[in-house]
């Protein structure tokens, strides 16, 4: 208080002018007090140049327009209280200023645009004056002898200012980043709205098409089905039926098909395991079925064998379950007292095979072959397939395999086409039904006829003698 009164008495209106010229800097990061109007000097200083002992900035500093360095006080307590000037009670431009600094200046930002600086001074007073346009800074010091410049404290303060500015810049960048994130979120939401299109409702019963596959039967449409047995692609039911007819495929997956060890996977192992379980389940079911345990009557088999033996034919029948046994449709007609045979015809030169059922034993071989190789009476479709036999001028030869021969020894009987089937089957062994091989005469084949073998053996004996 006394210090303020003495200053008021010495300076007169100068102190009032200083108070009016002092205002807070509105720029963030600048904590100094600016003096826009020059203050009268204390102790002989000129008006407008500030107090005595003030350092003026040279021309080089003004030209470079660098920010003036602030000189902190080392462990000084500065107090400044301005009281009892006319019309004002510590109020400067509508703002309260109470400056208190202990140990080092502290700056507190309470509101944006409002800065309260508290400084308490006991022996010396430092006032920093700066102009925005001219960058002029004036320092007023009561006792310049007590002011010491310490580089360490100055560097610390500069670092604190730099850190504070960095923090503010980071906050500003943080707000920008948040705004960018919000903008990106909005864009993502818009994209999701665009992507959320109504699902396509496929018609009922529409199956997924096999990618990049064509029907292997017609070759025009895209494949929709794949046969589990032969893995052939098909597009429709007619193509499925056609491929089954052409390849004699039943469409059922072959559980016992061969798979190499390189292609064997866990799915194949699981399939084999389930197959064995099915076999065990079927065997257990059969063992528990009382009806299946009954012995099958063999009266019909014995009757067929006895009738064939009476006619001089050695007929052999296979047990139930064999394929040839299932295919056999031979029966004995009691009214006519003759056999109606199941006959298989094979044409090796055309790779064709046909079956004749209910063939009476009094029918000749030529009559049996007439619907196949006769140029006039044969079926047109069969004639087209057996055109090699129809166009042949050498004629055909009818052979039948000899049963119960030694291993890897295959021989054939040559049948007489002008004799009946019964005459050709006498004194021969027949397993289930006769199979006739129709070959072209003079064709090079590995079929050796029994008559040729006998003639060759007799020739060899004559040459030795």
Swiss-Prot record:
Origin species: Pongo abelii
InterPro entries: BCD1, Znf_HIT
Protein name, as recorded: Box C/D snoRNA protein 1
Stretches for region Disordered: 1-72
Gene it is expressed from: ZNHIT6
Keywords recorded for this protein, A-Z: Isopeptide bond, Metal-binding, Phosphoprotein, Ribosome biogenesis, Ubl conjugation, Zinc, Zinc-finger
One MF annotation (Gene Ontology) recorded for this entry: zinc ion binding
UniProt KW Phosphoprotein keyword: yes
Cross-link type Glycyl lysine isopeptide (Lys-Gly) (interchain with G-Cter in SUMO2), residue numbers: 79, 108, 118, 138, 148, 157, 168, 178, 195, 454
Cellular component GO terms held in the UniProt record: nucleus; pre-snoRNP complex
Keyword Iron recorded: no
Residue spans, zinc finger HIT-type: 215-249
Role according to the record: Required for box C/D snoRNAs accumulation involved in snoRNA processing, snoRNA transport to the nucleolus and ribosome biogenesis.
Biased composition (Basic and acidic residues): 56-70
GO biological process: box C/D snoRNP assembly; maturation of LSU-rRNA from tricistronic rRNA transcript (SSU-rRNA, 5.8S rRNA, LSU-rRNA); snoRNA localization
Residue numbers carrying Phosphoserine: 25
Family note: Belongs to the BCD1 family.
Residues annotated to bind Zn(2+) 2: 227, 230, 243, 249
CDD domains membership: zf-HIT_BCD1 (cd23023)
Pfam families assigned to the protein according to its UniProt record, in alphabetical order: zf-HIT
Residues the entry annotates as binding Zn(2+) 1: 215, 218, 235, 239
Subunit structure and binding partners: Interacts with FBL, SNU13, NOP58, NUFIP1, RUVBL1, RUVBL2 and TAF9. Interacts (via HIT-type zinc finger) with the RUVBL1/RUVBL2 complex in the presence of ADP.
């Amino acid at each position: 208080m006394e210090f303020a009164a003495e200053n008021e008495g010495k300076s007169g209106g100068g102190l009032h002018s200083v108070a009016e010229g002092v205002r807070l800097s509105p720029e963030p990061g600048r904590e100094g007090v600016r003096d826009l109007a020059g203050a009268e000097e204390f102790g002989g200083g000129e008006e407008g140049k500030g107090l005595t002992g003030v350092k003026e900035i040279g021309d080089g500093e003004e030209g470079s327009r660098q920010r003036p360095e602030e000189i902190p006080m080392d462990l000084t307590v500065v107090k400044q209280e301005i009281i009892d000037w006319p019309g004002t009670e510590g109020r400067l431009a509508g703002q309260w200023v109470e400056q208190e600094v202990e140990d080092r200046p502290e700056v507190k930002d309470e509101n944006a645009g409002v800065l309260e600086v508290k400084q308490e001074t006991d022996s010396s007073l430092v006032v920093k004056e700066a102009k925005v346009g001219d960058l002029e800074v004036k320092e007023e010091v009561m006792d310049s002898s007590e002011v010491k410049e310490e580089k360490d404290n100055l560097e610390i303060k500069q670092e604190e200012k730099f850190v504070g500015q960095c923090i503010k810049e980071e906050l500003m960048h943080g707000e920008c980043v948040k705004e960018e994130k919000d903008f990106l979120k909005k864009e993502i939401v818009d994209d999701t709205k665009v992507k959320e299109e109504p699902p396509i409702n496929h018609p009922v019963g529409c199956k997924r098409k096999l990618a990049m596959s064509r029907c292997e039967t017609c070759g025009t449409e895209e494949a929709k089905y794949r046969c589990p047995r032969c893995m052939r692609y098909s597009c429709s039911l007619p193509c499925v039926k056609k491929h089954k007819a052409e390849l004699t495929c039943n469409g059922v997956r072959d559980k016992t098909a061969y798979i190499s060890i390189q292609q064997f996977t866990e799915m194949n192992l699981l399939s084999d395991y389930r197959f064995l379980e099915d076999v065990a389940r079927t065997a257990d079911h059969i063992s528990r079925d009382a009806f299946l345990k009954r012995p099958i009557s063999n009266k019909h088999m014995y009757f067929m064998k006895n009738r064939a033996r009476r006619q001089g034919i050695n007929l052999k029948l296979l047990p139930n379950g064999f394929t040839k046994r299932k295919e056999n449709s031979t029966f004995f007609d009691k009214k006519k007292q003759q056999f109606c045979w199941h006959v298989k015809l094979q044409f090796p030169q055309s790779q064709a095979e046909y079956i004749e059922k209910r063939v009476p034993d009094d029918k000749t071989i030529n009559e049996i072959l007439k619907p196949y190789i006769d140029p006039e009476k044969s079926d047109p479709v069969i004639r087209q397939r057996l055109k090699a036999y129809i166009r042949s001028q050498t004629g055909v030869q009818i052979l039948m395999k000899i049963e119960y021969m030694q291993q890897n020894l295959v021989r054939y009987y040559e049948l007489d086409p002008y004799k009946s089937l019964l005459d050709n089957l006498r004194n021969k062994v027949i397993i289930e039904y006769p199979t006739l091989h129709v070959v072209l005469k003079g064709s090079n084949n590995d079929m050796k006829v029994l008559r040729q073998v006998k003639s060759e053996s007799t020739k060899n004996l004559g040459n030795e003698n």
